[in-house]
């Protein structure tokens, strides 16, 4: 593929991110009419020639999740029927990813696999995503999946602020690998919060493994949803004598009363990226700060289109 053939289209989920990405690429955003019929069905019309082009559909499957997902599927179908040479679904925040396995023989779906099947069925040739909730989701696809990492963006902000007496904290055992990687890059200590989760979207902090007294604690996670876990973790760290608690998370889901919880919690600052657009109350919250991943996504798209290495973006 040549650079001249690269095109980017988007739906209604995160148009600002799409505009920032094409600005980085120095191209125009693909023209398409994405709307609704009178009964609420998704309506799509591609308004320019895409025949033979390398096309990316940039859309996070964030709230409204089902509409965002349906828009991707319908846009991809329209592009394939218009003879696009290759269509990559660029999904920075991959929704439905938290149900990635059956637990204890429960009668539940594996929604991450369902979404993978849906994307494949409409003719997606490749998937580009960022900080998947679990890496094994890549194996649910029979097409190439590029899962890029927001760590360089988050790490750059940490270096910029030059926090003193730093310690990286994993909010749970499942996030230890991510936290250990960050601690290695920062050449600092690692702490782990041991917790028990009595029911979905609720967690109880039980124990902190590591000495956080007098330290600047940086919590790292892939997403912040209800912020229950995050705020409880901040309180536990402060009780153990932490000087300050700063959280870094790629995906700002921030559902329900999450923003209110953050504002009234022991958390000093929450830093997120723009894979998901911030709600109005989150934008006004002085404890929530947003970084852009547009350059990282744009460079990833360019390298995919040019058949260049993506992994070299993340080599230490």
Swiss-Prot record:
GO terms for molecular function: ATP binding; kinase activity; magnesium ion binding; ribose phosphate diphosphokinase activity. Binds 2 Mg(2+) ions per subunit. GO terms for cellular component: cytoplasm; ribose phosphate diphosphokinase complex. Gene3D superfamilies: 3.40.50.2020. Its cofactor is Mg(2+). It catalyses: D-ribose 5-phosphate + ATP = 5-phospho-alpha-D-ribose 1-diphosphate + AMP + H(+). Its main location: cytoplasm. Mg(2+) 2 binds at residue 172. It is an enzyme of class 2 (transferase). Pathway: Metabolic intermediate biosynthesis; 5-phospho-alpha-D-ribose 1-diphosphate biosynthesis; 5-phospho-alpha-D-ribose 1-diphosphate from D-ribose 5-phosphate (route I): step 1/1. ATP binds at residues 39-41, 98-99. Keywords: ATP-binding, Cytoplasm, Kinase, Magnesium, Metal-binding, Nucleotide biosynthesis, Nucleotide-binding, Transferase. It is found in: Cytoplasm. Mg(2+) 1 binds at residue 133. GO terms for biological process: 5-phosphoribose 1-diphosphate biosynthetic process; purine nucleotide biosynthetic process; ribonucleoside monophosphate biosynthetic process. The active site is at residue 195. SMART domains: Pribosyltran_N. D-ribose 5-phosphate binds at residues 197, 221, 225-229. InterPro entries: PRib_PP_synth_CS, Pribosyltran_N, PRibTrfase_dom, PRTase-like, Rib-P_diPkinase, Rib-P_diPkinase_bac. Its EC number is 2.7.6.1. Involved in the biosynthesis of the central metabolite phospho-alpha-D-ribosyl-1-pyrophosphate (PRPP) via the transfer of pyrophosphoryl group from ATP to 1-hydroxyl of ribose-5-phosphate (Rib-5-P). Belongs to the ribose-phosphate pyrophosphokinase family. Class I subfamily. HAMAP family: RibP_PPkinase_B (MF_00583_B). Homohexamer. NCBIfam families: PRK01259.1, ribP_PPkin. This is Ribose-phosphate pyrophosphokinase.
């Amino acid at each position: 593929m040549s650079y001249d053939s690269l095109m980017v289209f988007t739906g209604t989920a995160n148009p600002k991110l799409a505009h920032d990405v094409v600005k980085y690429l120095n191209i125009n955003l693909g023209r398409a009419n994405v709307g609704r019929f009178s009964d609420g069905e998704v309506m799509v019309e591609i308004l320019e020639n895409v025949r033979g082009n390398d096309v990316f559909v940039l859309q996070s499957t964030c709230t409204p999740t089902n509409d965002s997902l349906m828009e991707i599927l319908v846009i991809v179908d329209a592009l394939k029927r218009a003879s696009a040479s290759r269509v990559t679904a660029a999904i920075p925040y991959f929704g439905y990813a938290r149900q990635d396995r059956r637990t204890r023989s429960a009668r539940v779906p594996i929604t991450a696999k369902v979404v993978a099947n849906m994307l494949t069925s409409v003719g997606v040739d490749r998937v580009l995503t960022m900080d998947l909730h679990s890496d094994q989701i890549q194996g649910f696809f029979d097409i190439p999946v590029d899962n890029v990492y927001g760590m360089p963006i988050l790490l750059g902000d940490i270096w910029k602020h030059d926090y003193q007496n730093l310690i990286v904290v994993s909010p749970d055992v499942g996030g230890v690998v991510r936290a250990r990687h960050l601690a290695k890059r920062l050449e600092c200590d690692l702490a782990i919060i041991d917790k028990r989760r009595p029911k979905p979207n609720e967690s109880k902090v039980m124990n902190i493994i590591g000495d956080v007294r007098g330290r600047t604690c940086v919590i790292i996670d892939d997403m912040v949803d209800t912020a229950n876990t995050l705020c409880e973790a901040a309180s536990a760290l402060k009780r153990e004598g932490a000087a300050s608690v700063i959280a870094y998370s790629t995906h700002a889901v921030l559902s329900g009363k999450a923003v209110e919880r953050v504002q009234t919690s022991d958390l000093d600052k929450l830093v997120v990226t723009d894979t998901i657009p911030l709600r109005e109350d989150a934008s006004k919250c002085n404890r929530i700060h947003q970084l852009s991943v547009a350059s990282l996504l744009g460079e990833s798209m360019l390298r995919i289109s040019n058949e260049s290495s993506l992994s070299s973006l993340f080599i230490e």
